């Protein structure tokens, strides 16, 4: 019975999408009051994504449009069904944080069939005719992580703890990191003793991978962790092994990570202004729904096309510039961090 009901729901959703597919993409001319924005987000399990959701929704509403956000909690099938639902409801533009960069191409296909444009938010959907991509310079993120770690140690055993292999950004972070590390590796100054992706960006898996290495080699000089979640898992493993204080990078400027930086167990994080990203994306979503022209600053190839892209600059954060960066920007307060 359940399978029958699911089948009927999907069939109904697809039928409604087919009914909508009568207008070519971009032909409507709407006022802001008429615009309905759909935001399909991978997960709300990580601290930063709550911020994206809240800021994005608030900005869309400030612009006079309607918005609905659906989170898939890391499930590809759920994310595709959520996109179907929003298309069935008649959204004018779809903003997507993909769980899987390849599988999410199906969402673009469905949206275009319904005459709806797609913005790839923060993570690039691969091998699809994505209309616009907005994110940060993600190779630069990896470079910033390594450069700060090298300020503390430039020889020895290094570990690279990556993000989810299904996330295109994880590959870009690694590319940026390795572009800086490679000369040190080539001349024998640095030995990479761990180089793995972390399934689902799960801190527990990052911890397990680190513990496996430490069980055979209790001599780690630095860890490049792709984000603050994986950094937290790594630091737990290092602390258990009596290696707290080993330089560890991160990303996202999560409150827990910034507190670790103050405590000296994490070396740095990379701040990507969620205010800037979410507000910019919201404005662009409404503009695209109204069929207005969008200025982009470059293109990024996603395996199929060169996607018009807007890339914002990431900022390295250490214990020396917390006040000048994330506090000044209003992302966190002194009370949040130091109390």
Identify what each model region corresponds to.
Residues 13-339:
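A residue-level marker of the well-folded mature domains of exported/periplasmic proteins
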Residues 1-18:
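Sec-dependent N-terminal signal peptides of Gram-positive bacterial secreted proteins and lipoproteins
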């Amino acid at each position: 019975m359940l399978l029958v009901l699911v089948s009927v729901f999907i069939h109904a959703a697809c039928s409604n999408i087919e009914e909508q597919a009568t207008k070519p993409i971009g032909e409507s001319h709407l006022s802001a009051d008429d615009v309905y924005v759909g935001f399909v987000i991978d997960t709300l399990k990580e601290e930063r994504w709550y911020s994206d959701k809240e800021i994005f929704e608030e900005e869309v509403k400030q612009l006079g449009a309607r918005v609905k956000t659906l989170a898939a909690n890391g499930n590809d099938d759920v994310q595709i069904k959520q996109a179907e639902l929003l298309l069935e409801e008649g959204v004018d533009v779809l903003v997507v944080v993909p769980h899987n960069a390849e599988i999410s191409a199906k969402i673009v296909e469905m949206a275009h069939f319904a005459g709806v444009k797609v913005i790839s938010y923060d993570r690039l959907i691969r091998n699809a005719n994505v209309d616009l991509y907005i994110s940060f310079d993600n190779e630069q993120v990896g470079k910033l992580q390594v450069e700060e770690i090298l300020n503390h140690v430039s020889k020895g055993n290094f570990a690279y703890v990556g993000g989810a292999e299904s996330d295109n950004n994880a590959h870009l972070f690694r590319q940026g990191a390795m572009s800086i590390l490679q000369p040190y590796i080539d001349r024998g100054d640095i030995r990479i003793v761990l180089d793995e992706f972390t399934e689902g960006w799960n801190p527990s898996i990052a911890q397990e991978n680190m513990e496996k290495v430490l069980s055979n080699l209790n001599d780690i000089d630095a860890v490049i962790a792709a984000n603050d979640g994986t950094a937290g898992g790594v630091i737990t493993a290092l602390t258990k092994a009596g290696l707290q204080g080993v330089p560890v990078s991160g990303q996202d400027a999560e409150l827990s990570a910034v507190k670790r930086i103050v405590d000296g167990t994490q070396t740095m994080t990379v701040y990507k202004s969620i205010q800037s990203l979410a507000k910019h994306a919201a404005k662009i979503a409404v503009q695209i729904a109204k069929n207005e022209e969008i200025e982009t600053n470059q293109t990024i190839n996603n395996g199929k096309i060169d996607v018009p892209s807007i890339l914002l600059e990431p900022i390295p954060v250490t214990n020396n510039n917390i006040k000048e960066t994330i506090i000044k920007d209003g992302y966190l307060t002194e009370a949040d961090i130091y109390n």
